[in-house]
Amino acid sequence: MSEQYPVLSGAEPFYAENGPVGVLLVHGFTGTPHSMRPLAEAYAKAGYTVCLPRLKGHGTHYEDMERTTFHDWVASVEEGYGWLKQRCQTIFVTGLSMGGTLTLYLAEHHPDICGIVPINAAVDIPAIAAGMTGGGELPRYLDSIGSDLKNPDVKELAYEKTPTASLLQLARLMAQTKAKLDRIVCPALIFVSDEDHVVPPGNADIIFQGISSTEKEIVRLRNSYHVATLDYDQPMIIERSLEFFAKHAG
């Protein structure tokens, strides 16, 4: 799938080559690397080799996204993982929202991943399933899900429309990921916002109970909505994830 539109300013991927420990960061559905950039820069500053790709069909125009499948998004993440594998002995993966879903998906297929940090990750959004099976013809595009932030001074760089076809792809990705959670054995630090208007917070419990990891923890974010990586709890997410990397990097 070739994209027809230019990349939006601020939606560019981010790479930093540093030490032998790498971190792959994955942004969310309809979003861009912008939502994960503060974390990527903090990890790079701490000496980690960092890869923050732009998912296929994202960060350009929602018509580009409409032409992609979840396999394209997986391929974008696999490519980033491969880039890190060439440079690093140890790799962690973190992601926001669908980026968290892709984090879980990757851990299901790559048991050598050292640890994962899903942030408001999605494996079950009943509203999507209800919308798809509710009967009647759905519009081609729905309103944006972006910028669910408690901080009124911050805006997420994301599409103003959501392609209905892409929601179906997200539903398929979530279903496949949820079905194989028990394959995950690496340490997991699971962040969840108490108030999230996009992904029900109960997803964190589904993930926690579903994965086979012996080392796993849920950290509740009291002062952020869905896009927690840009919200009030951002410093805490950075601090706790850096502690997690240091602990498990050996």
From Swiss-Prot:
**Pfam entry (one):** Hydrolase_4
Q: What does its pH dependence look like? A: Optimum pH is 6-8.
Where's the active site on this chain?
Answer: S97, D196, H226
Write the record's keywords in alphabetical order, separated by commas: Hydrolase, Serine esterase
| Regulation of activity | Not inhibited by cholate, but slightly inhibited by triton X-100 and deoxycholate. Completely inhibited by PMSF (phenylmethylsulfonyl fluoride) at a concentration of 200 uM.
Annotated thermal dependence: Optimum temperature is 75 degrees Celsius.
- Catalyzed reactions: Hydrolyzes glycerol monoesters of long-chain fatty acids
Instruction: Kindly list the positions annotated as binding substrate.
Output: F29, M98
Q: What class of enzyme is it?
A: hydrolase
Q: What is its EC number?
A: 3.1.1.23
Q: Does the keyword RNA-binding apply?
A: no
Site keyed Important for substrate specificity: positions: I145
Q: What is the effect of changing D196N?
A: Loss of enzyme activity
* Molecular function, one GO term: monoacylglycerol lipase activity
Protein family membership: Belongs to the lipase/esterase LIP3/BchO family.
Annotated function:
Hydrolyzes monoacylglycerols, with the highest activity occurring with 1-monolauroylglycerol.
Q: How does it assemble?
A: Monomer.
Extra remark: This lipase is not secreted extracellularly as other bacterial lipases.
Q: What is the designated name of this protein?
A: Thermostable monoacylglycerol lipase
Q: Which organism is it from?
A: Bacillus sp. (strain H-257)
